[in-house]
């Protein structure tokens, strides 16, 4: 059983005030990372026993804030806000920059990618894990929120597997769109090939 408990709930208008979201902080995470739950009530009618749509979103400063074309993180976050605001559910915003290696290390990996290495090879050359994220904390956050069953908005099967291993019932995998551009196509193709992300390209 998780030691995580809810610390504070605060309503914040996002999208220039067009969307109301409840930001939720937690007690009991010894990692020192300030993971946040974001709740959207949903704008369309739903049954009382409906299963919430949930997105585990790992922090990406370059994509989420600056709209980097080297990844699809910003577009995925925007899509998650749109869809979960409509259907009701949670975004768990996890402080796992660079698939868990941190911002500075991610920039070092980008420099290696500019030399022709793929995203996973670059991490390996830096003696870092190709994906250092532990989604057990997301399961603990859901348990603290009283959520035991989810519809998971993701193309990444590892997220679902880790939630299941930590006691969360994943009722459905809901794929995100493929946000491809000239800068990130190779990156996305590598994720599909090496980590079995469910991405379908035109």
UniProtKB/Swiss-Prot annotation:
Any idea which positions bind GTP?
Answer: 55-59, 76, 97-99, 119, 154, 159
Task: Give the family from UniProt.
Answer: Belongs to the GTP cyclohydrolase II family.
One GO biological-process annotation of the entry reads:
riboflavin biosynthetic process
Requisite cofactors: Zn(2+)
| Cofactor binding notes | Binds 1 zinc ion per subunit.
A single cellular component GO annotation: cytosol
Q: Which residues form the active site?
A: 131 (proton acceptor), 133 (nucleophile)
Q: In which pathway does it act?
A: Cofactor biosynthesis; riboflavin biosynthesis; 5-amino-6-(D-ribitylamino)uracil from GTP: step 1/4
Q: What is its EC number?
A: 3.5.4.25
Name of the featured protein: GTP cyclohydrolase-2
Which UniProt keywords are present, listed alphabetically?
A: GTP-binding, Hydrolase, Metal-binding, Nucleotide-binding, Riboflavin biosynthesis, Zinc
Q: Which domain of life is it from?
A: Bacteria
Q: Which GO terms describe its molecular function?
A: GTP binding; GTP cyclohydrolase II activity; zinc ion binding
Sequence positions that bind Zn(2+): 60, 71, 73
What biological function has been recorded for the protein in this entry?
A: Catalyzes the conversion of GTP to 2,5-diamino-6-ribosylamino-4(3H)-pyrimidinone 5'-phosphate (DARP), formate and pyrophosphate.
List the catalytic activities from the record.
Answer: GTP + 4 H2O = 2,5-diamino-6-hydroxy-4-(5-phosphoribosylamino)-pyrimidine + formate + 2 phosphate + 3 H(+)
